[in-house]
């Protein structure tokens, strides 16, 4: 992503969010460092026996083979083929997982990976979005699952990871239409029926909060819908309403799938259905009451937007107040359906931000999601709300993960939580050193914060590194590697090679080494510590 100059206003939130998705990186304040350092030494054995450590990928980013064996295009195929990536890359190649999955599952076993999280491509399994199942797609996922079972690797499947079938997008505008609920439920039914005898952990959607903002407010993600002044280069959309509609339909679709599973499959398959959100921890920019209120408001808009309905059956009161008639209402029947519809929640977490109030003048002109939230996001307390907005380096704050886990414990009735993405990328770099000590340091510190939250009563069930190997990164292409294993994208054979972090993770999981947080996070480090992106 190109660095831009702009004024950091509420509407800049979408841009910051996208950058965080692409290039999360280390930083931590001195206060957080001291807190994390108190965790001292730990090993795999310090975590509960049922706690799982894994790593993940997603279908479009990993599989490649986008035009093979009957797969139809997704909205990400359309987006990248239109040349909308900064480097004009596409996911056509991915990491070659469609043909190299057996090799990769062996790598997982060699790494002592306990669990693997991947997503299913809706357009590979059901190319027309509904109706006939693609035998080749079914064969691929069955074979992948069988390989994982044979290696004793716990399987975590995400049904939807941002890659909506283009054919349904063309038919009724995808998540904007309530028609998506029936089609998504029918797709999930196929997955439960065909794979549920071996899969017990199902996540319905990845990051519906990001989908709603990035694709329907700023228009940066496909299907690129927005309206001025909130987004640029969109040919259709309404940023003031559509993010709320998309989130609403996503929640209802999730609840419909959960009801299907509980009614038809759970008694025999004994599995669990949850939903995933993107999260970062929020600190008040100052001690003012306005900034403190804005910090909680930002949590409600980012986290509560999705989780309040799943746990309590309705949106946060502050969202209903700020958005008014632009946010849809749940009927009494819908509220009953969505309440308690998640057996667990998954979070993707990389960094933290500072929040200041931006409510002055918030009633002037049209309002989108970010204006309703009325909060300014900063990378650190030294940031100014002007000049270069998109930084080349982002904060690392392991304490923020602990705070988020404990917030979820206190706010959402102790619902089980999986950290489904946490990782370190070199944004803008074409190569990622095999000697990736910075990634080891990053993962060590966040794993330590996970343990600290566990010891404080957070109901955390697992931790997944993003990503198991280098993949096509959304909006960064092949130039922001996050993987534990290096992939040579210049070689048509896409050879894999374990990085230092893969060897380190393997030794930790086998109990051969411990982690000393004090050596990773020393109390005298300051809030300006960053890793290059």
UniProtKB/Swiss-Prot annotation:
Alphabetically ordered keywords of this record: Disulfide bond, Glycoprotein, Glycosidase, Hydrolase, Signal
EC number(s) from the headed UniProt entry: 3.2.1.21
GO biological process, one term: carbohydrate metabolic process
Disulfide pairings: 226-234
Molecular function in Gene Ontology: beta-D-fucosidase activity; beta-galactosidase activity; beta-glucosidase activity
Origin: domain of life: Eukaryota
Binding-site residues, a beta-D-glucoside: 61, 161, 206-207, 350, 421, 466, 482
Family: Belongs to the glycosyl hydrolase 1 family.
Name assigned to this protein: Beta-glucosidase 22
Species this protein is from: Oryza sativa subsp. japonica
């Amino acid at each position: 992503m190109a660095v831009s100059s702009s004024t950091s206003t509420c509407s800049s939130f979408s841009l910051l969010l996208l950058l965080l998705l692409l290039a999360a990186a280390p930083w931590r304040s001195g206060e957080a460092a001291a807190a994390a350092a108190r965790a001292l030494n730990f090993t795999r054995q310090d975590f509960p026996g049922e706690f799982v450590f894994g790593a993940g990928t997603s279908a479009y980013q990993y599989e490649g083979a986008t035009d093979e064996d009957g797969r139809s295009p997704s909205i990400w195929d359309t987006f990248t083929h239109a040349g909308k990536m900064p480097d004009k890359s596409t996911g056509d190649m991915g990491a070659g997982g469609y043909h190299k999955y057996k090799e990769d599952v062996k790598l997982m076993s060699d790494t002592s990976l306990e669990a693997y999280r991947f997503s299913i491509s809706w357009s590979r399994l059901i190319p027309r979005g509904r109706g006939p199942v693609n035998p080749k797609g079914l064969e691929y996922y069955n074979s992948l699952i069988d390989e994982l079972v044979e290696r004793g690797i716990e399987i975590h499947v995400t049904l939807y990871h941002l890659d909506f079938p283009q054919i349904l997008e063309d038919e009724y505008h995808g998540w904007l239409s309530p028609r998506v609920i029936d089609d998504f439920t029918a797709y999930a039914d196929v997955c439960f029926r065909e794979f549920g005898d071996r899969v017990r952990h199902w996540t319905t959607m990845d990051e519906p909060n990001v989908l709603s903002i990035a694709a329907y407010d700023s228009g940066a993600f496909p299907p690129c819908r927005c309206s001025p002044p909130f987004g640029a280069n969109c040919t259709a959309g309404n940023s003031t309403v559509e993010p709320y509609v998309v989130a609403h339909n996503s929640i209802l679709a999730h609840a419909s799938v959960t009801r299907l599973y509980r009614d038809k499959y759970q008694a025999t398959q004994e599995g669990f259905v949850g939903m995933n959100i993107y999260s970062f921890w929020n600190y008040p920019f100052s001690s003012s009451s306005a900034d403190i209120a804005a910090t909680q408001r930002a949590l409600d808009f980012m986290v509560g937007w999705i989780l309040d309905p799943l746990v309590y059956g309705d949106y946060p009161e502050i969202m209903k107040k700020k958005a008014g008639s632009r946010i849809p209402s749940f009927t009494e029947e819908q509220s009953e359906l969505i309440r308690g519809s998640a057996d667990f929640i998954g979070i993707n977490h990389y960094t933290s931000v500072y929040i200041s109030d931006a409510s002055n003048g918030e009633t002037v002109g049209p309002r989108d999601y970010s204006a309703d939230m009325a909060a300014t996001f900063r990378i650190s307390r030294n940031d100014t709300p002007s000049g270069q907005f998109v930084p080349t380096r982002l904060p690392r704050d392991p304490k923020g993960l602990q705070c988020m886990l404990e917030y979820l414990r206190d706010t959402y009735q102790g619902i089980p939580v999986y950290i489904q993405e946490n990782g370190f990328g070199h944004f803008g770099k074409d190569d990622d050193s095999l000697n990736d000590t910075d990634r080891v340091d990053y993962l060590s510190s966040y794993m330590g914060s996970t343990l600290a939250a566990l010891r404080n009563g957070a109901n955390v069930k697992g931790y997944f590194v993003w990503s198991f190997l280098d993949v096509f990164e959304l909006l960064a292409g092949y130039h922001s590697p996050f993987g534990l294993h290096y992939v040579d994208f210049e070689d048509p054979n896409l050879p894999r090679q374990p990085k230092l972090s893969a060897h380190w993770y393997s030794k930790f999981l086998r109990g051969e080494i411990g982690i000393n947080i004090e050596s990773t996070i020393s109390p005298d480090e300051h809030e300006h510590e960053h890793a290059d992106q």
